[in-house]
Amino acid sequence: MNNNVFHFPVLLDAICKLIEDLPVKSDLIYIDSTLGEGAHAKAILEKYDFLSLVGIERDSQILERAKQFLLIFKDRITYFNDWFDNFFANYPLNVKANFILVDLGISMFHYKDSKKGFSFLEDEPLDMRLCSSSCSISAAEIVNTFSKYDLESLIYNLSNEHYSRRISKAIVEYRKIKKIQTTKELQSIINKVYPFSKVKINPATKTFQALRIYVNDELARLKRSLPLWVENLAKDGILAIITFHSIEDRIVKDFFRSLSCDLYVKISKKPIIPSSDEIKKNKPSRSAKLRAVKKI
């Protein structure tokens, strides 16, 4: 396994500013709901010695990487190998959190080194399960068994892919001849039916996004977690959520809007986005949006 940490901590300066706005800076609890390789956690723990970290990560493989990466801070960290919605539904701590961070992006490790088929840049088995024991269906099973209508609905509803009908038809026609097993196979099917005059990103990008979201139940997990996150904030505590596509950002935006003004206040009216300098250094950050709310 490649032990280099791939993940660049997106919107780190904005996150640090939120932490600096906490009124008390002594013995505070910081929960990283999506620990990943620990890039955000390392930068935050280095800068703020008054924080203790609770790190939540469902993928046991990437959690072990994070533990090694954060070894110097081991006395300040408690780890949980779990989905964040399960953790907060059965909240195990005897104190509320002062700062909760949620980064909904997929780690670079999963794209570059997991061999689970999250990326079409390498030819890998079409799996996409972050946790095979709790995710019942793989991406390969979806593209090989779902009806044309169900594929079209899945791809459109989870990625806003305008050519979902064309793509789903091509998938169904292809699998009549041969089972779809790898990322490159699926990418090739999509590329052949996509109008290249319309291409701004790789034609397969949105379909892969939709499959990943479905396989890992990402949107339902987010919706379940939102009320649990705010419920488990301490007074003056802050919940910060980084989204990477319009569907999940809308869910977060609408939830924050629904909160009582007597109990919570939005940190900013509009989402915080990366600077041009950050995007130059880390191209995947270009679609990131940070929304935050404070419990009063």
Curated annotation (Swiss-Prot):
Its annotated function is as follows: Specifically methylates the N4 position of cytidine in position 1402 (C1402) of 16S rRNA.
What does the UniProt keyword field contain? Cytoplasm, Methyltransferase, rRNA processing, S-adenosyl-L-methionine, Transferase
The record lists the catalysed reaction(s) as: cytidine(1402) in 16S rRNA + S-adenosyl-L-methionine = N(4)-methylcytidine(1402) in 16S rRNA + S-adenosyl-L-homocysteine + H(+)
Family matches, as Pfam families: Methyltransf_5
Query: What sections of the sequence does the record tag as coiled-coil?
Result: none
The GO cellular component terms are:
cytoplasm
Where is this protein localized, as stated in its record?
A: Cytoplasm
* Its EC number(s): 2.1.1.199
Q: Which family does it belong to?
A: Belongs to the methyltransferase superfamily. RsmH family.
Q: Return the protein name.
A: Ribosomal RNA small subunit methyltransferase H
Q: Which GO terms describe its biological process?
A: rRNA base methylation
Annotated S-adenosyl-L-methionine binding lies at: G38, A39, H40, E57, F88, D103, H110
Primary enzyme class: transferase
Q: Does the keyword Transferase apply?
A: yes
In the record, what lineage is assigned to the organism producing the protein? Bacteria, Pseudomonadati, Spirochaetota, Spirochaetia, Spirochaetales
Does this UniProt record's set of keywords contain Methyltransferase?
Answer: yes
Task: Using the UniProt record, give the first listed, main subcellular location.
Answer: cytoplasm
